């Protein structure tokens, strides 16, 4: 028979320390009565040693009066009241325990995570000129709030219906001191935070697929981003990445040539002051060489020559390149989408969005799109990149970093914001005061967008990584289990025989996983694991917005903008 004992839960040690504590408390009660009682009755204290005093009282050689008894009772009541008060406070500030909380006691705590607690985080923020501690992460199991600082970037992996929006996205948006950019495929995050954010700055909602049923009251010109051939290539990459179906087969030649062709047409339209609709027009007229002349006149002869070569290619080859390019730019065929990226018609009033102006204030931009066929994801990605790069330009102009950090909450990043270069740029943005939080539903989602090595690079570049449960990918969970580490326990074996009687042996070198794959796959709702640079993995309790300090403000925003709540309240 063998019984494992985790060293963090040594029963014998608990009993020993409990006895010591009881002796100390009894000593305090006794000596308080002895010393104070003697002072009140004018008697002299015959012993300063509590043990000697107790022996004296028992033998009758040391004074003990009615006053001593009363004082001892009062001290006992005060100590009991204090203990009850501390217990009640802990009970009031803690959530019900779960099956993984015992494992949490063997993970990061105390000095290991002190830099994420409010006091240390606030001191670090003030060094950067910011008066708030950072993005809220969660609370420790003992109830202390943890924050991600204003130089950190985050990656979160939460499975479906695990509370990522209520516990991470919304609290992070509300905590932002400067501009905010949010991507999503649902309207809930907009309804919950719009009313709060509009009190500090302008709110822009980009909703070309009517996710939140928001009308096109403004527009953005994607070609305003295209200032040279490099930016044109970047924009073409966003179209290519955002339009490609998961698992779709690609041809290296046609894909590359189509992307170059699309980039050339984007550059030509931008340099000629044309709307983005002209790009798709050129893609449907395979022998139209208007763009070739524009590129030559704009000083891009090599790019013009490349376009001319594609136009002059054999019909099948030319058709293949143009066909792939049209597929990449497919979102430009939607009239609803084009309303958001083309100038207003005569008599129509729609303000033009300017990324450089946006990042200078405490403004908010919500970027909404659906995934799948007809997605506006390429434009969501393009506008996201335009805003982040505008923030970077401002940071450089200000000496290296933004005075008020900008928060980019990339919720559903793998579905609606497929920014291929993000892993290569991630760690750089934190130093600029651009705080990016990429939220995924699984590790494999990231692999689809960035590839296996790209996803590893993104994960490694993040200062704060949060796993919120709900994932069943054993390889990923196995790596998390290894990062969390092992606990050491003693194995007690008792054997018996008629000849020698019973014998007891202890093996103190046993190890096991603190949380194994099955534990992580079944992580209870309300619990998450935080991996912070320089600290052990930490078990935390998630804090939904409705239990936080901004609950009333969020409820007011929902009452104003959430159609379901408006109907429930008797509205239209």
Spans of features found by a protein language model:
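Basic- and hydrophobic-enriched, low-structure N-terminal and domain-boundary segments
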Residues: 1-162, 166-169, 497, 570-572
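Glycine-centered flexibility motif
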Residues: 49, 138-139, 273, 442, ...
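Acidic, low-complexity intrinsically disordered regions
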Residues: 13, 44, 60, 83-84, ...
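Conserved ATP-driven motor cores of ASCE-family P-loop NTPases powering translocation/secretion/packaging/pilus
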Residues: 426-529
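P-loop NTPase motor domains
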Residues: 25-38, 141, 145, 150-434, ...
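A short glycine-/small-residue-rich loop at the edge of a beta-strand within enzyme catalytic domains
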Residues: 20, 378, 413, 453, ...
């Amino acid at each position: 028979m063998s019984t494992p004992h985790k060293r963090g839960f040594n029963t014998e040690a608990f009993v020993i320390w409990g006895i010591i504590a009881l002796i100390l408390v009894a000593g305090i009660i006794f000596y308080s009565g002895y010393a104070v009682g003697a002072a009140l009755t004018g008697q002299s204290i015959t012993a300063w040693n509590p043990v000697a005093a107790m022996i004296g009282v028992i033998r009758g050689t040391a004074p003990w009066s009615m006053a001593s008894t009363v004082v001892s009772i009062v001290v006992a009541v005060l100590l009991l009241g204090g203990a009850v008060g501390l217990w009640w406070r802990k009970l009031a500030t803690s959530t019900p325990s779960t099956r993984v909380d015992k494992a949490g006691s063997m993970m990061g705590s105390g000095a290991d995570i002190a830099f994420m607690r409010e006091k240390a985080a606030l001191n670090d923020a003030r060094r950067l000129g910011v008066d708030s501690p950072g993005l809220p992460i969660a609370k420790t199991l003992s109830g202390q709030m943890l924050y991600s600082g204003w130089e950190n970037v985050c990656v979160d992996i939460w499975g479906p219906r695990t509370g990522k929006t209520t516990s991470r996205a919304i609290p992070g948006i509300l905590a932002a001191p400067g501009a905010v950019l949010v991507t999503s495929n649902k309207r809930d995050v907009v309804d919950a935070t719009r009313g709060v954010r509009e009190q500090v700055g302008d709110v822009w909602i980009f909703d070309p697929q009517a996710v939140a049923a928001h009308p096109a009251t403004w527009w953005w010109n994607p070609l305003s981003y295209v200032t040279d051939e490099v930016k044109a290539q970047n924009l073409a990459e966003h179209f290519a990445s955002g339009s490609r179906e998961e698992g779709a087969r690609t041809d290296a030649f046609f894909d590359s040539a189509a992307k170059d062709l699309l980039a050339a047409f984007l550059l030509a339209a931008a340099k000629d002051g044309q709307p983005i609709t002209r790009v798709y027009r050129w893609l449907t007229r395979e022998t139209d060489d208007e763009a070739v002349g524009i590129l030559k006149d704009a000083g891009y002869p090599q790019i013009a020559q490349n376009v001319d070569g594609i136009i002059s290619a054999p019909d099948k080859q030319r058709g293949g390149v143009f066909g792939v390019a049209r597929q990449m730019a497919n979102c430009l065929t939607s009239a609803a989408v084009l309303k958001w990226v083309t100038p207003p018609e005569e008599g129509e009033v729609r303000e033009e969005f300017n990324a450089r102006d946006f990042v200078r204030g405490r403004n908010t931009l919500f970027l909404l799109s659906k995934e799948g066929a007809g997605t506006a994801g390429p434009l969501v990605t393009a506008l996201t990149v335009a805003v982040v790069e505008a923030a970077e330009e401002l940071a450089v102009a200000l000496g290296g970093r933004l005075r008020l950090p900008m928060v980019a909450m990339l919720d559903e990043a793998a579905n609606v914001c497929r920014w291929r270069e993000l892993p290569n740029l991630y760690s750089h943005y934190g130093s600029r005061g651009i705080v990016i939080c990429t939220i995924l539903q699984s590790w494999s989602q990231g692999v689809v967008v960035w590839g296996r090595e790209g996803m590893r690079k993104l994960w490694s570049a993040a200062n704060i990584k949060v796993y919120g449960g709900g994932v069943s990918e054993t390889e990923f969970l196995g790596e998390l289990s290894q990062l969390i580490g092992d606990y050491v326990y003693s194995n007690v074996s008792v054997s018996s025989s008629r000849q020698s009687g019973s014998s007891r042996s202890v093996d103190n070198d046993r190890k096991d996983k603190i949380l194994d794959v099955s534990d992580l796959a079944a992580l209870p709702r309300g619990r998450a694991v935080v991996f912070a640079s320089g600290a052990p993995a930490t078990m935390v309790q998630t804090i939904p917005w409705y239990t936080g300090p901004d609950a009333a403000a969020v409820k007011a925003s929902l009452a104003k903008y959430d159609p379901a709540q408006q109907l429930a309240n008797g509205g239209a």
